[in-house]
Amino acid sequence: MFNAGNWLLLIFTGCMVLIINGCSTGSWRESSRESAQIAPNPTITREAVIHVYSADAWGWRGLFAVHTWISVKPSNADSYTVLEVIGWRERHGLPVLRIEEDIPDRYWFGSKPELILEKRGEGVDELIDKIIEASQYYPWANTYKVFPGPNSNTFPAWIALKVPELKLELPFRAFGSGWAE
């Protein structure tokens, strides 16, 4: 029969197993950042595309939280622009908000992204313009705090508030998304 001490040991052991399994044995530097092959090829797909992705955070944080980002491709563009917040940039004196031409659907340091929103075709160019315009006024472009925010999930949540016709809903595990409200 289990007594209180045995229950505590069982709970502690279970938590340790979860944490250990959530921690990668490798370095984030060695983790995949390749395309997950979710986004349509921009040289073939001529229509406008908006994708919002979510992927488990790095290491043990991935047990609880996700990283979210936005990728856009205007009509007839040959590449995607990725809009995301990356916290380590702050330590290097860079804005945490990164808006650059990049692979739209990269693995997030080993975690395969999940497509949480897709908009394509007619009217999407106008939405892209609104996203880009709103991003210029993001109030925390140089500020990052893992918890409670502002963090990587605050930016897409803020865009969702500024561009409501996007109809973006972030996953429950997007901690920091409430900071934008």
Regions found by a protein language model. Give the residues of each.
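A general structural-boundary detector
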Residues: 10, 56, 142-143
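Activation targets extended, charge/polar-rich intrinsically disordered C-terminal tails
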Residues: 24-36, 132-181
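C-terminal motif of bacterial Sec signal peptides marking the signal peptidase cleavage site
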Residues: 19-22
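A cross-kingdom signal targeting lumenal/periplasmic-facing segments of multi-pass membrane
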Residues: 101-135, 139-142, 159, 163
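N-terminal Sec-pathway targeting helices
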Residues: 1-12
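Glycine-rich catalytic cores of cysteine/serine-nucleophile enzymes that process amide/ester linkages
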Residues: 26-39, 43-118
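Soluble non-cytosolic domains of exported or imported proteins
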Residues: 63, 118-125, 146-151
